[in-house]
């Protein structure tokens, strides 16, 4: 198998962990006769230092042309890094949001598995830790608060911040379907977490989820 992998080393510990991940991929190539080529893509603080913005159109094009993208970490110390003297839309994390949107990466999969060797370090109740767990947590990435309108303004002499939470039925339906598809390969159980007793967006989420 031949693959071109976009490599985003990113910031902070990113270059270090990406270098180790590439060693693993290279070993996979050796063992299974695959061929991986790598294209470096700048994102976040590294892109700000090089180009003055957290993500360039060229970087988005490079990521889209890749078969997969390997990413380290994005951002730095908000107290000391000059990146955080910039307005929010030009900070490292803004580039990450742009990349998610540009690649349509709407579903974030986060497995949580408790291995026997780590049960003693688990902060959950012993009866839960003893049983162990194997969860797949899915988070929606391209809608909602992160991509809604936001503002901070003074109203009647008081600073007031606003963040708009918006989802449409198509955004909800596609991530619900992805959740169901994954569940069919596991234990065939899906739990949707919402706040439908208060939020309109959660009521729509529950309605579309049930209908899907």
Where do the PLM segments sit?
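Generic N-terminal amphipathic, Lys/Arg-enriched alpha-helix
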Residues: 1-12, 39-41
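Generic secondary-structure signature for well-ordered alpha-helical cores
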Residues: 26, 30-34, 65-68, 101-108, ...
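N-terminal glycine-rich phosphate/adenylate-binding segment common to multiple enzyme folds
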Residues: 49-161
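Short, ordered loop/turn segments at secondary-structure junctions
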Residues: 10-12, 43, 74, 114, ...
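Short, active-site-adjacent cap segments at secondary-structure transitions
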Residues: 46, 77-78, 198-200
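N-terminal beta-loop-helix "entrance" segment that forms/cooperates
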Residues: 33-57
